[in-house]
Amino acid sequence: MSGIDPKRFGKVAVLFGGESAEREVSLTSGRLVLQGLRDAGIDAHLFDPAERPLSALKDEGFVRAFNALHGGYGENGQIQGALDFYGIRYTGSGVLGSALGLDKFRTKLVWQQTGVPTPPFETVLRGDDYAARATEIVAKLGLPLFVKPASEGSSVAVLKVKTADALPAALSEAATHDKIVIVEKSIEGGGEYTACIAGDLDLPLIKIVPAGEFYDYHAKYVADDTQYLIPCGLPAAQEAELKRIARRAFDVLGCTDWGRADFMLDAAGNAYFLEVNTAPGMTDHSLPPKAARSIGISYSELVVKVLSLTLND
């Protein structure tokens, strides 16, 4: 697909593993990315920052990195800043886009100021009076609600709350993962979708139909009964407009090159954006490979396309 001489990429590190709650997902993503790059003849090697200092990248002659780290320092701008310091080109967003993209609270603040629709929400801080805040939030947002740590990915510690009595415990649990907790009004009626972004590729939307209550960690990476509908079933004009809004949701955060934007539709077909992902999973359950495969792009071709974006000025 790319027609790029593999030698142009030089020595490539596939960053994987790390120390976040998403380490196991990242290990799987990294190994598959490595195979995809090597299948294309690229000189790629695994590199786990949890086991080796980043300075080794420069010492060992790496000139480029495919970031398959998920969550934590791999996705919050820290790795990106270090790679900038060492002069190593890397996939995905830079420091600002990565930091904002992993922070659901500040993502939503930016979207509110730039006209990107997002569900109504409240924030709770670790140590707040959870019972009192729960009463206030239910009165303001109603039920059901989603409770999530502000800076975890892969739906780690995300809980759906259907009763007011269950909310204080959900707040307490989420606060063990992050000092800021997002409580979001549940958008019902139209389903969950994702828009995958990879440079100028026109990837189709995916409708996600989990067997359980919502698309949680188990549905994303373990279960085989989650349905991924491609095509998504929406009229072509509506799909095109939603992809346009998704790209805007990505761009206003300073995100670049590739990632995902997730959103819900209500019963009237209105979109509400939930989050972006600047270092999407690349496992056999992950969404970007599914979207690419549906239009005839292999896994190897997709990872080469993503890596090729690091050749741009």
UniProtKB/Swiss-Prot annotation:
Binding, ATP: 138-193
Alphabetically ordered keywords of this record: ATP-binding, Cell shape, Cell wall biogenesis/degradation, Cytoplasm, Ligase, Magnesium, Manganese, Metal-binding, Nucleotide-binding, Peptidoglycan synthesis
Lineage top rank: taxon: Bacteria
GO CC terms in record: cytosol
EC class (word): ligase
Residues that, per the record, bind Mg(2+) 1: D262, E275
InterPro entries: ATP-grasp, ATP_grasp_subdomain_1, D-Ala_lig_Van_CS, D_ala_D_ala, Dala_Dala_lig_C, Dala_Dala_lig_N, PreATP-grasp_dom_sf
Localization of this protein: Cytoplasm
Pathway stated in the Swiss-Prot or TrEMBL entry: Cell wall biogenesis; peptidoglycan biosynthesis
Binding sites annotated in the UniProt record for Mg(2+) 2: E275, N277
GO molecular function, one term: ATP binding
Residues of the ATP-grasp domain: 108-308
Keyword Cell membrane recorded: no
CC cofactor note: Binds 2 magnesium or manganese ions per subunit.
Primary residence: cytoplasm
Catalytic reactions on record: 2 D-alanine + ATP = D-alanyl-D-alanine + ADP + phosphate + H(+)
EC number: 6.3.2.4
Cofactor(s) annotated in UniProt: Mg(2+); Mn(2+)
One record GO biological process: regulation of cell shape
PANTHER family found in the cross-reference section: D-ALANINE--D-ALANINE LIGASE (PTHR23132), D-ALANINE--D-ALANINE LIGASE B (PTHR23132:SF23)
Similarity comment: Belongs to the D-alanine--D-alanine ligase family.
Biological function: Cell wall formation.
Descriptive protein name: D-alanine--D-alanine ligase
